[in-house]
Design a protein with these regions (language model features):
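Short intrinsically disordered coil segments
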Residues: 67, 84, 220-221
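Extracellular/periplasm-exposed beta-strand and loop segments of Gram-negative cell-envelope proteins
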Residues: 22-24, 35-42, 79-82, 96, ...
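Outer membrane beta-barrel
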Residues: 1-75, 99-103, 108-116, 181-194, ...
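Outer-membrane beta-barrel pore domains
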Residues: 28-29, 40, 114-276
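Loop-centered beta-sheet repeat module
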Residues: 75-129
Length: 276
């Protein structure tokens, strides 16, 4: 078909956010995947389905879209051992638990100088019963840009989850969630190293935040405080674009449902990722 109209049928990576479709380890300077792209939006979120995709381009820009109807989620979203709303727990994959399609669409525009901005939306039904139909939706905005002759790269994503939760459920199962992350990577050395002609040494920084329950207590009206904050500086060595050795220091604060003083943790992480 035309570049604007291409058909895809089979197992589809739902185009919600950017990380879900671009999750390969060698693309990143960080050992862990972002929390918002793994604990809000399910990691490597794919389902059986079909849809259209396409793009058009001008001199300095590219405009693309994707639109799919797929399977979606089941009621494990609000019936799981985590005792909170968790979309990754309710991925249906090749099965359609609700009997209804989940629709996902994305529109992205890329400028040669300014970078790429994407907006995506998912909506579906996760309950199996017609009489008690429960809906779920995800809205996401993502950005990716390279500057200073590709020596500075900025990547980020924000996701907002909303869903119907029966009134009989306890308040740990929130109706709204939000998460975001920003990665900043700068190349400080780019020259031949130990026989690798295009080796790079990069400094990196990730800031991320996830709020698993943005609701308020019905008794007091006070906000529910189940959230995680993290800052992750790192350094990496790339002998080529397809291989990365990385060292991260992850500092994280996690606040519980009741808003008690946050628990703090810190870890040094080592990683190697490559295409073989």
């Amino acid at each position: 078909l035309h570049n604007l109209f291409n058909l895809r049928v089979g197992l589809v990576l739902n185009p919600i956010g950017a990380f879900n479709q671009n999750h390969d380890g060698p693309n990143y300077e960080f050992v862990d995947r972002p929390l918002s792209a793994t604990t809000l939006i399910p990691g490597v979120f794919s389902n059986a389905g079909f849809g259209l995709y396409g793009k058009t381009k001008g001199t300095d820009w590219v405009l693309g879209y994707e639109l799919y109807a797929t399977n979606g989620f089941n009621d494990k979203i609000i019936d799981n051992t985590l005792e909170r709303t968790a979309l990754p727990e309710g991925v249906s994959g090749v099965e359609n638990f609700s009997g209804k399609a989940t629709y996902t669409g994305k529109l992205a525009i890329k400028n040669r100088l300014a970078g790429e901005l994407g907006v995506s939306y998912l909506r579906g039904v996760y309950s199996a019963w017609e009489a008690d139909e429960q809906k779920v939706a995800i809205f996401a905005v993502d950005y990716n840009g390279s500057f200073l002759h590709n020596r500075l790269n900025i990547r980020g994503e924000l996701a907002k989850v909303s869903l119907d939760v029966p009134d009989t459920y306890i308040q740990t199962y929130g109706k709204t969630q939000m998460g975001a992350y920003v990665d900043v990577v700068g190349t400080i050395i780019e020259r031949p190293i130990l026989g690798w002609e295009n080796a790079k040494i990069n400094l990196a920084l990730r800031l991320e935040y996830v709020d698993y329950n943005q609701d308020a207590f019905t008794e007091t009206g006070g906000g529910i405080a189940e959230h995680v904050r993290a800052i992750v500086p790192g350094i990496s060595f790339r002998p080529s674009d397809k291989t990365v050795f990385r060292v991260n220091y992850r500092f994280q604060e996690q606040t519980d449902f009741l808003g008690n003083l946050p628990s703090k943790s810190a870890a040094i992480q080592f990683g190697l990722s490559s295409y073989f």
